[in-house]
Amino acid sequence: MPSIVLKKALIFLPVIGLYFLRSGAIPITRDQGINALKKMGRNAKIAVKKNRSMMIFPQGTRVSPGVSSKEKPYLPGVFFLYSQTKVPVVPVAHNAGLIWPKNSFIKYPERLSSKSVTLKILPEIQPGLPKKEFLSRLETEIENASNELIKKELS
């Protein structure tokens, strides 16, 4: 089970919040800036020592299909984790936004002909890249693959 980096407010949700806590989630308070990053880094190092993978949305949240990374850029937190933990990053593209809209707990599988979310596991990015190169590669690979999955589902 991966340690999921998530906004702290999610741990207060009934049932699922307890699940997040018990599963080793890494809650962060977004408005705490550098302190949130430091805490996230400490918890991420603990997760790595326990041989756990981590999951983070690089834009800090789920993003609706069609919203460009220019409108909702990739945030430095994902690079911070990458640089602090020194482990490979495995980018994952998906088309979940088509059936699970942002700001909604309700899912709409009938919107897709396949009735299911498709994930595409992309080649891992080895540790050690400079920030600009890492973020550029991560963004390009995820955005291209996600757009391809969305286009395929809608065609």
Write out the residue ranges for each language-model feature.
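Soluble extracytoplasmic domains of inner/organellar membrane proteins
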Residues: 5, 11, 28-30, 41-44, ...
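Membrane-interfacial terminal anchoring regions of lipid-handling membrane enzymes
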Residues: 46-49, 97, 120, 129-155
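A conditional alpha-helix N-cap/helix-loop micro-motif detector
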Residues: 34-37, 71
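A cross-family acyltransferase "interaction/gating" segment
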Residues: 15-17, 49-55, 64-133
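Residues at or immediately preceding the N-termini of alpha-helices
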Residues: 33-34, 131
